[in-house]
């Protein structure tokens, strides 16, 4: 399925007010980098203005992987996901870790193939995020996350980490 077809499905699910079906479609058909980016956008929208510190550290790893996918960041995600302090973003870190391809878990080890199971991990992350919303607000939050899913698949992907704007002298 291409991104235009997925976008049409998401639009239909938004209009039908069936966000769970839209979340399922996104997690089954979106490319991995766009799934991870959607997870980051969703977390930042739920935890506005700033995520809890432990979640922020995990989101930083996931967002950096979107900007520059590398095995080093996949290993960092795997290590952070095993940490006792990691919270809900553990799901998103595992989506990065299991984004497919060979992964050498340590310097002495051998490269082990990892399946691309980013979709199920991202789905778990999104549903856990929604569970933190009060029940009355959950339907609105679900619709908002589907709008973010549309942004993640229709807008150009970021290619470099954002930088702080330079102050303009007046």
Could you describe each region identified by the protein language model?
Residues 1-155, 167-170:
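Structured binding/interaction patches within domain cores
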């Amino acid at each position: 399925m291409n991104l235009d077809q997925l976008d049409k499905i998401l639009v239909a699910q938004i209009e039908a007010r069936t966000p769970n079906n839209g979340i399922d479609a996104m997690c089954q058909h979106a490319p991995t980098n766009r799934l991870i980016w959607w997870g980051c956008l969703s977390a930042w929208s739920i935890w506005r203005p700033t995520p809890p510190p432990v979640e922020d550290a995990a989101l930083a790893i996931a967002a950096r992987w979107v900007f520059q996918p590398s095995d080093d960041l996949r290993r960092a995600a795997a290590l952070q996901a095993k940490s006792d302090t990691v919270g809900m973003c553990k799901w998103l870190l595992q989506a990065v870790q299991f984004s497919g391809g060979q992964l050498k878990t340590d310097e002495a080890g051998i490269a082990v193939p990892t399946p691309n199971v980013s979709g199920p991990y991202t789905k778990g992350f999104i549903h856990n995020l929604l569970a933190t919303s009060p029940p009355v607000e959950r339907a609105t939050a679900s619709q908002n996350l589907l709008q973010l899913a549309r942004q993640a698949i229709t807008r150009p992907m970021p290619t470099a980490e954002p930088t702080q704007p330079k102050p303009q002298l007046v």
